[in-house]
């Protein structure tokens, strides 16, 4: 089984567990150049808030979108947008990625700015 298939299998299992809980989830996706975060409704059909390194406000503060500092900034922005939408508690969906590096930085920044999971 390839690394990509293993990651996708882990992501499927995590999403199934979160769906059982009927919880709002913070879903994270990363590429080599950017990182994306979305807060998705319990039913999984609606995005309540989103942030990424492609946003104009984020791009003017960072030089490179594929590093830990950029991930921390996205974590801060998603937490602020979630609070503005009245969301304080989410389930963290790391999409099968290791909880390390950019994923960890995003999660820690979101927690620091008021999001609990």
From Swiss-Prot:
A single GO BP: translation
Protein name: Large ribosomal subunit protein uL18
Gene Ontology molecular function: 5S rRNA binding; structural constituent of ribosome
Keywords on record: Ribonucleoprotein, Ribosomal protein, RNA-binding, rRNA-binding
Classification of source organism: Bacteria, Pseudomonadati, Pseudomonadota, Betaproteobacteria, Nitrosomonadales
GO CC aspect terms: cytosolic large ribosomal subunit
Gene name for this UniProt entry: rplR
Highest taxon listed in the record's lineage: Bacteria
Family annotation (Pfam families): Ribosomal_L18p (PF00861)
Xref: Gene3D superfamilies: 3.30.420.100
Its biological purpose: This is one of the proteins that bind and probably mediate the attachment of the 5S RNA into the large ribosomal subunit, where it forms part of the central protuberance.
Cross-referenced PANTHER family: 39S RIBOSOMAL PROTEIN L18, MITOCHONDRIAL (PTHR12899), LARGE RIBOSOMAL SUBUNIT PROTEIN UL18M (PTHR12899:SF3)
Quaternary structure note: Part of the 50S ribosomal subunit; part of the 5S rRNA/L5/L18/L25 subcomplex. Contacts the 5S and 23S rRNAs.
UniProt family annotation: Belongs to the universal ribosomal protein uL18 family.
HAMAP family: Ribosomal_uL18_B (MF_01337_B)
């Amino acid at each position: 089984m390839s690394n990509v298939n293993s990651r996708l299998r882990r992501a499927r299992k995590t999403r199934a567990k979160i769906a059982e809980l009927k919880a709002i989830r913070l879903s994270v996706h990363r590429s080599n150049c950017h990182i994306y975060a979305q807060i998705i409704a319990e039913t999984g059909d609606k995005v309540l808030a989103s942030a990424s390194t492609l946003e104009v406000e984020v791009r003017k503060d960072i030089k490179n979108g594929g590093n830990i500092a950029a991930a921390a900034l996205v974590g801060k922005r998603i937490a602020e947008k979630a609070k503005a939408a009245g969301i304080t508690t989410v389930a963290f969906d790391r999409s099968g990625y290791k909880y390390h590096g950019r994923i960890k930085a995003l999660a820690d920044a979101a927690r620091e700015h008021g999001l609990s999971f």
